[in-house]
Amino acid sequence: AVVNVNFGEGQCYSGQVATPYPGYTPMIVKFDEHQKMPTTRIEYSYYLMAVDAGLQMMPSRLLEGEQTAHFLTERFDRRNGKKVHIQTLAAMNPPADSYEALFEAACRIGVPPGELRQLFRLMVLNVLGGNVDDHNKNFSFLMGDDGRWHVAPAYDYTFSVDPDAPYYVNRHSMTINNRTEGITAADLLE
């Protein structure tokens, strides 16, 4: 759900409203609905690990109740009450299914070279953390005020291996060195 939240007042309203009221922050809420796994708590712990590892992510938190914990993250596509122009890798290159294609797209649109480290960190963390939901809609680019494209903060970084699913479901969506499983350090560095 998209909402605008004022934590000081304990208030929120629909994020579909174009401009948030002063003191409200545009956020995305993921509700604690999974019966078998504490998915929102897992996503929050992955957020903390990723930030500690130097990955740029939007500020996030858990909203805990007696039996629930909802995950909230600030929206990166809003700045000062206005929409920020973004494009996913899927929008720029629909058939993109590899990290190589991600890096090629970033270079093609002129992302500053230093920001490619963000993409590399995310690739490594997706492999190490078991985030196999790394499809081309989970990588975005922002148009800066300077008119240049920039790597968007990472999002949807969480453990996504399903222990009850067939093995082929638990492969990475994007290939690394033509592999979706059994990815090695050599594959990451090639």
What function would you assign to each model-found segment?
Residues 177-190:
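Mobile late-domain/C-terminal helix-loop "cap" segments
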Residues 1-96:
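Conserved ATP-binding subdomain of kinase catalytic cores across diverse folds
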Residues 1, 25-27, 58, 69-74, ...:
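Structural beta-strand/beta-sheet cores of well-ordered domains, especially the beta-sheet scaffolds
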Residues 88, 157-163, 175, 187:
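Generic recognition of well-ordered alpha-helical segments
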Residues 83, 163-165:
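Cytochrome P450 core scaffold surrounding the K-helix E-X-X-R motif
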Residues 168-177:
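Short beta-alpha connecting loops at secondary-structure transitions
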Residues 35-51, 97-163:
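Conserved kinase catalytic-core segment
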